[in-house]
Amino acid sequence: MNLLILFFGYLFGSFPSGYLAGRIAKGIDIRSLGSGSTGATNVLRHIGKRAAIIVFLLDVFKGVLSILLAKYLLLNDSWQVAIGLSTLIGHIWPVWLNWKGGKAVATGLGIFLGLSWQVGLATLGVFIIMITLFRIVSLASVSASLALPLIMFLSFSGSNISLPFLIVSLLAMLLVIWRHRENIVRLIRGKEPRIGQP
């Protein structure tokens, strides 16, 4: 039963919201433009603000939904984390799109809002601060992912620490950094575009 739920978690994550936005709004394949990502940032740059907001909310919802399902079924922390990871993997490597999906940020946010809304909101706060200061989405995304494990650790007190939650925060951080490796190179070179730039 739990393995079946992992499969459905992957299917939730692999729902191609950004790809569908491109096809419906402009008849384009968003994967062929810009970063090639199906995430909200690439949608914003090549389709528009309204489509980007919808894609962002749908991607967050995918993460939240998978964790809420796990909690509804009274699954323990380890299984909640496993389902969250399967959803994140589905978002990054969707079978429907030849394994080419998003960069794990919005769906990752949804997963951590589901696991611990306080951690999710605090991590979102880091993103908002960085995007306000620098107006570079990738910098804000990487900064928030780096802060995530520390925020998760600080959210627990004493013996109340959930090892699965800490592990998944580290894995999510690594996935986000890996998916942004090209952005990081451009950041180092000072060539990463800000919001409003192509």
Swiss-Prot record:
Q: Where in the cell is it found?
A: Cell inner membrane
Provide the topology term for how it sits in the membrane.
Multi-pass membrane protein
A Pfam family of the record is G3P_acyltransf
Q: What is its EC number?
A: 2.3.1.275
According to the record, the segments passing through the membrane are 1-21, 53-73, 79-99, 111-131, 136-156, 158-178
Major localisation = membrane
Tell me the keywords, alphabetical order. Cell inner membrane, Cell membrane, Lipid biosynthesis, Lipid metabolism, Membrane, Phospholipid biosynthesis, Phospholipid metabolism, Transferase, Transmembrane, Transmembrane helix
Is Lipid metabolism one of the keywords UniProt gives this record? yes
What do we know about how this protein assembles, alone or with others? Probably interacts with PlsX.
Against PANTHER family, the record matches this protein to: GLYCEROL-3-PHOSPHATE ACYLTRANSFERASE-RELATED, INNER MEMBRANE PROTEIN YGIH
HAMAP family given in the database record: PlsY
Q: Which family does it belong to?
A: Belongs to the PlsY family.
What functional role does this protein have? Catalyzes the transfer of an acyl group from acyl-phosphate (acyl-PO(4)) to glycerol-3-phosphate (G3P) to form lysophosphatidic acid (LPA). This enzyme utilizes acyl-phosphate as fatty acyl donor, but not acyl-CoA or acyl-ACP.
What protein is this chain from? Glycerol-3-phosphate acyltransferase
Its source organism is Prochlorococcus marinus (strain NATL1A)
